[in-house]
């Protein structure tokens, strides 16, 4: 499942290519992609009609596009979901009409998928997606939003599209009402506004968020009997960390995943949070971690942090720090890779 660096790479691509555009048409090829939408497909299409995309915002792994009516288009990527930007040539809306200027788009309509259109898998392609022909559809396309052009485009006459591609159908889109943040700070990365979608209100701030309360996170971890890795991956405690970056942060901080939170000393606890944040910063610089074509950014480009992983997926290999053989253990139904010499279970009290 994409974690913070991978979702942030997607957010940055959406911010570059989509902010300021207006929805001119909606194609729903798989209604299950909207299963979380109140009112179903019709409500989704009606709610997006003529709406401007105001920003691209992320908190942890949660991503949303605020709209000009005060709501947001929320995206849950699940295990295999992708948001891909596409566009070419003089764009037309779903009704075959030429799009008007930004802010004066025709209403969005549903479009029935054309079975005669070739289904070509472009998910692994690294070429800039905005030059792709919109008539080419990726294999697992579920929803497509047709969008107007904007003045900053290299080819202003060209429209664009946002595709939800999802092989396993565990992700989806929905329109959400916005609510105020509990602390009055920004909802997330990408917007200064103190609002976030209602369905993300329970999601904690992530370790790269300037407004995160590190002392508060550490205090809650140190009061818990649960294992440290489970705490790092609790999205209501601190968001954005999944299996990959939990293993990497624990290795960097020399902490064993099964050590209870209450065994963390203040110094080690701070070291763990700082190490996990630093690993994610490094991953973000190279686009995150991609193990296959399912993990790409909004332009279809893969990340390269897999080359720098120190723990995750390295069971049986030498620890690059001490030379011991890395081991794999299942903790709480999740695989954990660690160094038995560097990460001793109870060595966290300092």
Q: Residue ranges of each PLM-predicted region?
A:
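Structured catalytic/nucleic-acid-binding cores of DNA maintenance enzymes
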Residues: 1-350
